[in-house]
C-alpha cells in the first residue's frame, strides 16, 4: 500500500538512546489517515508517530477495515515507487491483487503474506478483487539496514500454517515463534505473527529478550502483561522480556499481531513511499520516479501511476527523538 497523503511529512527515525529501557507497557494510539478521495478508505496508523517511530526495523503500520467495499470502493492503489524498505501485506478478510515492476503478479488472501523488497527501487499496484465485499487487514513496512538498502528488488509469497496453542493459535509470517519459523527472507532479525485467543484465554509466548515488541490489537478485550490494549492500539514493550503474556477477557475470540526485532541502530528518513538516509537521497528518488527512471513498469494495471507529491520547502532533516 502506498502512503497516498498529498502532503506527507518527513519522519526522521533515530537510533536508540543509551540508558536502561523503561519498564512496563507503552500504549500507542492510532491516527486516522484518509487514502485520498471522498469514497476512499481510511486507515489507522500507529507507526510512525512522535512517541515512537520504530519497533525493531518495523517503521510503518497501517490497520484498516472491516471496510465495506460497496461504500468505500475498496482498494485501488495505482503504481507507485518504494526504496530502502520491505512491504508486508497481511489480510483478515478480502483479497488484493498485487502487480510489480519485477514481473510479480499475485493475490494476497487472509492468512497469506506478501513481502516485497523495494531495495534500490521497485514500483507496484494493489487492487482489491471484484469478489471482495469486506476488506480488512494491515500494511507494514520494514526499514532496510544501510548495507542492504540498495539490494535488488524482489517479491515473496508464503502461507504459514496455524500453530495451535493452549488457548489459541498463531501464524508466523516472519521470524520465529511458538516453535515455527517462516522461510520468508529479511535483512534484520524480525518477528511478525498473527495470534488468535479463545474467549477468556491467557497465553504466554516465549520471545527473544533482545527484541523490542509491539502488539497491535485487531479485535477482543486484550491485556498485555495486565495492561489493557484496545482494538487499533499498538502496545510497546522494551527489550529485556523473555515472555509476553496475553489475555482475552472478551466472550468472543481476540485477534492481534505480534511484531518485534532488535532496536534498529540507524537513523532513517521516511517521506512518501521512500526510506532513505539523507535529504539528497529522497530528492533523487523522487526525481527518478517523476522521470520514469529506475523503478520499472507495472504491467496489467489499467490507469496512470501515482504522481509524486511536492517536497516541503525546507530540506528534510532530523526530528527530535521523543524516546
What residue ranges belong to the model's regions?
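Jelly-roll (double-stranded beta-helix
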Residues: 1-323
Amino acid at each position: 500500500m502506498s502512503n497516498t497523503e498529498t502532503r506527507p511529512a518527513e519522519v526522521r527515525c533515530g537510533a536508540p538512546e543509551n540508558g536502561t529501557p523503561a519498564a512496563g507497557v507503552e500504549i500507542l494510539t492510532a491516527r486516522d489517515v484518509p487514502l485520498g478521495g471522498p469514497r476512499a478508505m481510511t486507515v489507522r496508523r500507529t507507526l510512525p508517530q512522535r512517541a515512537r517511530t520504530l519497533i525493531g526495523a518495523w517503521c510503518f503500520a497501517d490497520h484498516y477495515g472491516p471496510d465495506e467495499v460497496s461504500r468505500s470502493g475498496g482498494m485501488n492503489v495505482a503504481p507507485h515507487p518504494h526504496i530502502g524498505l520491505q512491504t508486508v501485506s497481511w489480510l483478515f478478510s478480502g483479497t488484493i491483487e498485487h502487480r510489480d515492476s519485477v514481473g510479480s503478479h499475485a493475490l494476497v488472501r487472509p492468512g497469506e503474506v506478501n513481502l516485497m523488497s523495494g531495495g534500490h527501487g521497485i514500483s507496484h499496484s494493489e487492487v482489491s478483487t471484484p469478489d471482495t465485499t469486506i476488506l480488512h487487514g494491515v500494511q507494514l513496512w520494514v526499514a532496510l539496514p544501510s548495507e542492504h538498502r540498495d539490494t535488488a528488488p524482489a517479491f515473496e509469497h508464503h502461507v504459514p500454517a496455524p500453530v495451535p496453542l493452549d488457548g489459541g493459535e498463531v501464524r508466523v509470517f516472519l521470524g520465529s515463534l511458538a516453535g515455527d519459523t517462516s522461510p520468508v527472507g529479511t535483512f534484520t532479525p524480525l518477528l511478525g505473527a498473527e495470534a488468535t485467543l479463545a474467549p477468556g484465554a491467557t497465553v504466554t509466548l516465549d520471545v527473544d529478550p533482545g527484541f523490542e515488541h509491539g502488539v497491535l490489537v485487531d479485535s477482543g478485550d486484550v491485556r498485555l502483561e495486565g495492561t489493557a490494549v484496545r482494538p487499533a492500539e499498538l502496545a510497546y514493550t522494551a527489550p529485556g522480556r523473555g515472555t509476553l503474556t496475553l489475555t482475552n477477557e472478551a466472550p468472543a475470540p481476540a485477534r492481534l499481531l505480534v511484531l518485534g526485532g532488535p532496536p534498529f541502530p540507524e537513523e532513517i528518513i521516511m517521506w512518501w513511499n521512500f526510506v532513505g538516509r539523507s535529504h539528497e537521497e529522497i530528492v533523487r528518488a523522487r526525481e527518478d520516479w517523476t522521470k520514469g527512471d529506475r523503478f520499472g513498469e507495472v504491467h496489467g494495471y489499467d490507469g496512470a501511476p501515482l504522481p509524486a507529491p511536492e517536497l516541503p520547502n525546507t530540506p528534510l532533516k532530523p526530528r527530535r527523538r521523543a524516546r
